[in-house]
């Protein structure tokens, strides 16, 4: 047998091509029509052909063809609009848009390529690897099966037994099937980012971050000098001259400075020099302090603005007081609160007078002005040598505060001026009181538009003070003479016993009418026009009268309180009280509510605050709530805020507590079907008159 390779015919080499191989030897011709290069031995299809031109094609001369045109590529889009305007809500006008998007899209095509680093690319690469490995394993299995078949064929022929053939074939088929099915590798499980389970773990502490801000650097100056013995001496001499000049200025400004010692003057000058340095940052520091207090007392501010006691819906004739802020100052520690007054212009600002009611323990006095925006520290601080027993703020000039001292002096403080001394002060020459001043009250200006206020003292004098040319001028309005108490002195002189005035109040409509309460328990109805006699006398209380107050709505009604534990409501045309309330403790102060003619509050020495509403209950208080500890503190004064439903209460330890009235303590008239709710002073007067008429009818019957 011949090998299979000998049967194959031998291939003859191809004949050489009769063409010119060297193209460089043949001359090249340039076709004038087409401009293509043609060799001598090129094929026909390579040769140039005549160009076909359209009949309307423009024919240009050689000069026009050789002319060059420059083209400049710019990034501006010629189709972009140039005059787009948009309306500005901030300025209220149409504004021209200067920047226009110059992007022009010429061609877009959606691709089907996947990045290798993406999740989809990794999955596709993994599937390709699996398919390639499966194909390789299948090829290996097929080659092994072919080898096994070649080896088993001669063995089967030699055996010659036909009975074992089906068994062998069955086993071979089983082996082939096992080998033909490749073992698939386990597919790696891909994580699903959207399938997760919550597990508790320890929280991670947030790292600290530093914040920086750019600011203007402080100005710097270069200073150089020499220090020796005589220069130090000259510097000390200049400082001494400055101190002497400041002392002379203080002496000329205030006569009080004469009594002050050298140590006090040194303290004042040092404080003034320090205050000059920090005046630039006081306003910024005050704003920052208010911001800090706003965050600190945010829960209290929220209660003040929005909280209403929901339990009042289930109790008709009871109310509560919610404690809000507590105002105190270390400088006024253990000084009793002797006076409270709200500012007539700024509803969050109030003044507090500090002194002592114990005549054996008299000390200095303090005038503090607090704001509810900053409960931690007072807005203004003024100190005095004698205790402050009363104060009042001017209605038209809310920056003027008049105070009365325990030593009988009266003074006017101006909040606009930076110094801590009073702008005006009485003296022995100007007719000051000889006993403590218990109450002061601003009045209307006189005919010459001079400021005017009144004061009452234990020396029995009601004095009118007028500010004339930066000087206080006094006029005795009336002397509180006790009737039937005249005694004869030497040479037949009649000596009158003078009553001790403790409180007074002026009528809101009748300008000349006012009431005066005394330590003897009597109340005198007086007139500014008569200085020798009283219009009427009321045997009001068995002990000293602590407060007298006209009703803000009803012109005939006033109220008084005393240390004999009682609060009485009067009609000034009747000498007997309309209502009498026993509070089981000495009453320090009473105040009418500005929003209702029938609501008033009283404070007692056992630490309780009592709130009455005669339209709801004319026999008992609708709120009896302790504000301070009974054994340690005593309440001294109370005042209603003219706008907000809050009151301030002072005690004998120098603390002032702010309390919010619950809805039952400030009920308004209920709406009736088909009728509008009437509001105003006329409604309040009618409401109180209705109660007084019932009492008047009972008294006339008896």
UniProtKB/Swiss-Prot annotation:
Alphabetical list of Pfam families matching this protein: WD40
Localisation per UniProt entry: Cytoplasm, Cytoskeleton, Cilium axoneme
Keyword annotations from UniProtKB, A to Z: Cell projection, Cytoplasm, Cytoskeleton, Dynein, Microtubule, Motor protein, Phosphoprotein, Repeat, WD repeat
GO molecular function, one term: dynein heavy chain binding
The organism's place on the tree of life at top rank: Eukaryota
InterPro entries assigned to the protein according to its UniProt record, in alphabetical order: Dynein_IC, WD40/YVTN_repeat-like_dom_sf, WD40_repeat_dom_sf, WD40_rpt
GO CC annotation terms, alphabetical: microtubule; outer dynein arm
Residues bearing PTM Phosphoserine: 134, 137
Broad class of where this protein is predominantly found: cytoplasm
GO biological process, one term: outer dynein arm assembly
Spans of repeat WD: 383-423, 432-475, 540-580, 582-622, 630-669
Residue ranges, annotated region (Disordered): 1-58
Alphabetized PROSITE patterns for the sequence: WD_REPEATS_2, WD_REPEATS_REGION
Family: Belongs to the dynein intermediate chain family.
Subunit and partners: Consists of at least two heavy chains and a number of intermediate and light chains. Interacts with BICD2. Interacts with CFAP45 and CFAP52. Interacts with CFAP53.
Job of this protein: Part of the dynein complex of respiratory cilia.
Protein name according to UniProt: Dynein axonemal intermediate chain 1
Organism from which the protein derives: Bos taurus (Bovine)
Gene from which the chain derives: DNAI1
């Amino acid at each position: 047998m011949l090998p299979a390779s000998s049967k194959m015919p031998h291939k003859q080499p191809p004949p050489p091509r009769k063409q010119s191989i060297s193209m460089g030897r043949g001359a090249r011709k340039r076709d004038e029509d087409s401009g293509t290069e043609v060799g001598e031995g090129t094929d026909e299809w390579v040769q140039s052909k005549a160009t076909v031109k359209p009949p309307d094609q423009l024919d240009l001369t050689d000069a026009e063809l050789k002319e060059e045109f420059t083209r400049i590529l710019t990034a501006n889009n010629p189709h972009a609009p140039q005059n787009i305007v948009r309306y500005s809500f901030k300025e209220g006008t149409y504004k021209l848009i200067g920047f226009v998007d110059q992007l022009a899209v010429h061609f877009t095509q959606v691709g089907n390529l996947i990045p290798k680093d993406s999740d989809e690319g990794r999955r596709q690469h993994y599937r390709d690897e699996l398919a390639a490995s499966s194909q390789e394993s299948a090829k290996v299995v097929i080659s092994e099966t072919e080898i096994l078949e070649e080896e088993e064929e001669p063995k089967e022929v030699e055996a010659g037994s036909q009975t074992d053939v089906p068994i062998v074939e069955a086993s071979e088929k089983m082996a082939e099937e096992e080998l033909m099915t490749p073992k698939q590798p386990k597919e790696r499980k891909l994580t699903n980012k959207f399938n997760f389970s919550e597990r508790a773990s320890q929280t991670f502490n947030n790292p600290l971050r530093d914040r920086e801000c750019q600011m203007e650097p402080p100005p710097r100056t270069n200073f150089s000098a020499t220090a020796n013995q005589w220069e130090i001496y000259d510097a000390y001499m200049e400082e001494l001259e400055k101190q002497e000049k400041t002392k002379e200025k203080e002496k000329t400004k205030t006569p009080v400075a004469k009594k002050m010692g050298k140590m006090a003057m040194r303290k004042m000058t040092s404080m003034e020099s320090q205050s000059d340095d920090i005046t630039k940052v006081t306003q910024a520091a005050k704003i920052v302090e208010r911001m800090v207090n706003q965050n600190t007392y945010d829960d209290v501010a929220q209660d003040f603005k929005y909280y209403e006691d929901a339990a009042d819906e289930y109790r008709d004739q009871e109310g509560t007081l919610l404690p809000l802020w507590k105002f105190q100052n270390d400088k006024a520690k253990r000084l009793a609160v002797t006076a409270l007054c709200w500012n007539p212009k700024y509803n969050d600002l109030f003044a507090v007078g500090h002194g002592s009611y114990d005549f054996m323990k008299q000390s200095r006095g303090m005038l503090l002005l607090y704001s509810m925006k900053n409960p931690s520290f007072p807005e203004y601080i003024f100190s005095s040598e004698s205790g402050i027993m009363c104060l009042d703020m001017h209605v038209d000039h809310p920056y003027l505060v008049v105070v009365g001292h325990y030593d009988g002096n009266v003074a006017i403080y101006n909040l606009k001026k930076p110094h801590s001394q009073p702008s005006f002060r009485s003296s022995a020459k100007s007719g000051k009181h000889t006993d403590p001043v218990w109450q002061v009250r601003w009045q209307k200006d006189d005919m010459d538009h001079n400021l005017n206020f009144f004061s009452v003292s234990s020396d029995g004098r009601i004095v009118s003070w007028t500010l004339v040319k930066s000087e206080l001028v006094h006029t005795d309005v009336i002397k509180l003479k006790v009737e039937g108490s005249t005694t004869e002195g030497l040479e037949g002189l009649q000596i009158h016993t003078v009553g001790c005035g403790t409180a007074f109040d002026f009528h809101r409509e009748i300008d000349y009418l006012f009431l005066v309460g005394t330590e003897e328990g009597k109340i005198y109805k007086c007139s500014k026009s008569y200085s020798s006699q009283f219009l009427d006398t009321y045997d009001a209380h068995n002990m000293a009268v602590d407060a007298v107050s006209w009703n803000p709505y009803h012109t005939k009604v006033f109220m008084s309180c005393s240390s004999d534990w009682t609060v009485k409501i009067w009609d000034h045309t009747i000498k007997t009280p309309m209502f009498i309330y026993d509070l089981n403790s000495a009453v320090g102060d009473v105040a009418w509510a500005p929003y209702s003619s029938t609501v008033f509050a009283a404070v007692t020495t056992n630490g309780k605050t009592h709130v009455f509403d005669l339209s709801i209950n004319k026999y008992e208080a609708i709120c009896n709530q302790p504000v301070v500890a009974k054994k340690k503190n005593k309440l001294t004064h109370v005042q209603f805020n003219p706008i907000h439903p809050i009151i301030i209460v002072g005690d004998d330890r120098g603390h002032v507590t702010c309390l919010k009235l619950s809805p039952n303590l400030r009920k308004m008239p209920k709406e009736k079907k088909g009728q509008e709710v009437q509001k105003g002073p006329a409604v309040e007067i009618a409401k109180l008159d209705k109660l007084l008429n019932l009492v008047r009818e009972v008294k006339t019957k008896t």
